[in-house]
């Protein structure tokens, strides 16, 4: 049992995120704009005509928008059965989209070097071995393709980080139903402030443009994981520099996160 718990933690709490994606499984129209901001130097339009793998696909939100943008084929991989069930439901109308159970740390060798683009949006920073996962994802990128990442930044989060970490320390240890109840209560209390406070950071300013349900899911999401890395620019340069034959472009986006595109030469 202890070994199973350690494995789940190493993989980034997939069962807890699975509960989230089964609960918040609807693909909201506003999520397209969120994704476009996370992609940074890579445009959503550039997915047209590409074969894509999304690592940590959750309920299939990102693959949905990739197909809508014109991707020729999309494979979403995740470790949690609940997440995969929600993703299958969301992608069922697309003949060129499918999902598969797989770990970012151990991707199928049969797909190595076969994708024009591999994306990992909001997942790498929750893994115990991000370097290993990066190498596995990079091995799946075809010559001339690229790897697209979105990760938490230490820059822009220094003031909020103690608050976030306090709630995360609580939420990651509570039973999932209790964490969900606490997240709902926090959202109710925070909603008036989100609407009223003139935040300087782009990310927090944009929260007021999202629906209440979306904000609730974001707060819940922040309380779930056992692992959450916040990386500096130097950290991102080190991580992306590990990839042989890669040319990284790193952008600071939304005032609190990193978007990176690493092109394979």
Task: Please report, for each region that a protein language model flagged, where it lies by residue.
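A short SAM/SAH-binding and catalytic strip from SAM-dependent methyltransferases
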Residues: 117-128
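Short conserved AdoMet
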Residues: 92, 128, 142
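A short glycine-rich, Lys/Arg-flanked "PGG" loop and its adjoining helix->strand segment in the class I
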Residues: 131-143
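Short alpha-helix
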Residues: 227-243
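Conserved class I S-adenosyl-L-methionine
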Residues: 146-178
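Extended, charge-rich helix/loop segments that form flexible
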Residues: 172, 176-214
């Amino acid at each position: 049992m202890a070994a199973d718990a350690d494995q789940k933690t190493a993989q980034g709490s997939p069962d807890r995120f699975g509960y989230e994606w089964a609960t918040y499984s609807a693909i909201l129209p506003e999520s397209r704009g969120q994704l476009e901001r996370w992609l940074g130097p890579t445009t959503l339009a550039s997915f047209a005509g590409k074969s894509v793998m999304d690592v940590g696909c959750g309920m299939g939100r990102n693959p949905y928008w990739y197909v809508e943008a014109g991707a020729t084929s999309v494979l979403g991989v995740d470790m949690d059965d609940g997440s995969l069930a929600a993703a299958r439901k969301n992608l069922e109308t697309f003949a060129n989209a499918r999902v598969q159970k797989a770990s970012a740390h151990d991707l199928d060798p049969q797909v190595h070097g076969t994708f024009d683009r591999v994306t990992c949006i909001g997942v790498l920073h929750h893994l115990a071995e991000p370097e290993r996962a990066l190498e596995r994802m990079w091995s799946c990128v075809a010559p001339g393709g690229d790897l697209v990442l979105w990760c938490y930044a230490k820059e822009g989060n220094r003031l909020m980080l103690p608050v976030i970490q306090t709630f995360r320390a609580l939420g990651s240890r509570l039973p999932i139903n209790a964490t969900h109840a606490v997240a709902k209560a926090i959202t109710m209390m925070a909603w008036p402030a989100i609407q009223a406070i003139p935040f300087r950071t782009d990310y927090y300013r944009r929260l007021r443009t999202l629906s209440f349900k979306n904000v609730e899911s974001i707060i819940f999401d922040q309380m779930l994981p056992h692992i959450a890395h916040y990386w500096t620019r130097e950290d991102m340069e080190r991580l992306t520099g590990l990839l042989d034959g890669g040319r990284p472009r790193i952008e600071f986006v939304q005032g609190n996160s990193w978007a990176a595109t690493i092109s394979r030469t």
